[in-house]
Amino acid sequence: MIKELEDIFKEAEKDMKKAVEYYKNEIAGLRTSRASTALVEEIKVEYYGSKVPIKQLGTISVPEHNQIVIQVWDQNAVPAIEKAIREELNLNPTVQGNVIRVTLPPLTEERRRELVRLLHKITEEARVRVRNVRREAKEMIEELEGISEDEKKRALERLQKLTDKYIDEINKLMEAKEKEIMSV
């Protein structure tokens, strides 16, 4: 019986970690006043009939605080990458041979507030994912046969502590990202 309980906790923790990792990847793509490779890495590009992230088509670097450079390995992919960046980021990259430069304009106050609103929306979705994991684990604990009410109560308290830990982690990541977005 205890083994079943431990399995429920392991599974719940694994799923909560996944939710936090997914959240980290999602907010990494949110633009701040500093250039970051995460801004373009996951943008999908049409390449020989399939959608491929830019990071698989070239080397991405940040030579200056407001510039991203993509050294494309296959010259044929350059127009598709340029188009994808225009569409996804609404920016105009400059192309020199197989090198694509993306210069980021400074963020306006209005755009910063917009990004913070988006950050809050993404954060709430992440919290909901963690709470859904808790709900599923709670249902599994309550359905367990052969454990006392006290054991169930302790298990549910432990589950709540686990949930709080991951919600706190999400909140800390959000606060750091918000500070990053709002800094000039």
From Swiss-Prot:
One of the record's GO molecular function terms: ribosomal large subunit binding
Location of the protein in the cell: Cytoplasm
GO biological process, one term: translation
Alphabetical list of InterPro entries matching this protein: Ribosome_recyc_fac, Ribosome_recyc_fac_dom, RRF_sf
Any single Gene Ontology cellular-component annotation: cytoplasm
CDD domains reported in the protein's UniProt record: RRF
Entry keyword set: Cytoplasm, Protein biosynthesis
Top-level taxon in the UniProt lineage: Bacteria
Similarity-based family: Belongs to the RRF family.
Matching HAMAP family: RRF
Purpose: Responsible for the release of ribosomes from messenger RNA at the termination of protein biosynthesis. May increase the efficiency of translation by recycling ribosomes from one round of translation to another.
Protein's recorded name: Ribosome-recycling factor
Gene behind this protein: frr
